[in-house]
């Protein structure tokens, strides 16, 4: 993203006296970008395959963060990839055993059909590796085990996931769900706040927030957002992210 910005800037205001980017530095950056684009293509293909697999088995796959947020970047495949975060819901919950939620049934299916071992040692998601990429299958949006106060947030997020979402179709016809703009705004802000409190906030996470809000701000109920942001204790943090992003 830095190289994209510099290329745009240098195109309109070329550096004088050969004070631009050194040739070797630019070649190094270009190599990194080409690798990033290759990884993004692989990432996209794996997500589409998983979405098709789950849909055929009767599950709707909601994609959290990552690939969905890359769609708001000026050049989507220049957003670095990471693991794949998903949240699964039954396409038809009638007759389903409520003691075995969608994520649990889907993990069993992954093992039975694909022979993939699933790690269930984590607090609010299971983990497995599909074609070399780590997948986190979330049964919670937030970790309700770490703080009891997170439970009302979890209920809020799950209600929004069930009642409001956006469908996305890949070129191969596979379909998945993205969170609604409101849920995305709350979830990404909360995720960033937790990361900042625990360790740090990196440039990619800040750009995810800034570019998403810039594009979808008209689709967000801001009264609802700020009411819940205050209740979650992250109002000042969100204001700081917004101020830095301007």
Segments predicted by a language model, with ranges:
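Conserved NTP-donor binding/palm subdomain of two-metal-ion nucleotidyltransferases/polymerases, i.e.
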Residues: 1-82, 88-246
């Amino acid at each position: 993203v830095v190289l994209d910005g510099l290329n745009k800037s240098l195109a309109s205001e070329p550096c004088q006296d050969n004070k631009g980017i050194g040739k070797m530095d630019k070649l190094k950056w270009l190599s990194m970008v080409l690798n990033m684009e290759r990884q993004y293509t692989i990432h996209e293909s794996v997500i589409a395959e998983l979405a098709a697999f789950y849909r055929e088995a009767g599950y709707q796959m909601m994609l959290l963060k990552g690939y969905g947020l890359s769609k708001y970047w000026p050049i989507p495949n220049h957003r670095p990839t990471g693991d794949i975060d998903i949240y699964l819901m039954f396409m038809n919950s009638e007759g389903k055993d409520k003691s075995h939620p969608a994520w649990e049934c889907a993990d069993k299916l992954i093992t039975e059909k694909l022979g993939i071992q699933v790690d269930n040692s984590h607090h609010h998601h299971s983990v497995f590796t599909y074609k070399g990429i780590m997948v986190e299958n979330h049964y919670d949006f937030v970790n309700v085990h770490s703080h009891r106060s997170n439970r009302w947030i979890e209920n809020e997020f799950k209600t929004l996931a069930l009642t409001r979402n956006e469908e996305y179709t890949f070129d191969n016809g596979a379909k998945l769900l993205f969170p609604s703009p409101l849920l995305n705004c709350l979830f990404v802000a909360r995720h960033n706040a937790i990361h900042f409190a625990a360790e740090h906030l990196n440039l990619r996470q800040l750009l995810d927030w800034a570019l998403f809000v810039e594009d979808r701000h008209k689709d967000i109920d801001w009264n609802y957002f700020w009411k819940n942001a205050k209740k979650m204790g992250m109002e000042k943090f969100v204001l700081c992210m917004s101020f830095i992003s301007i």
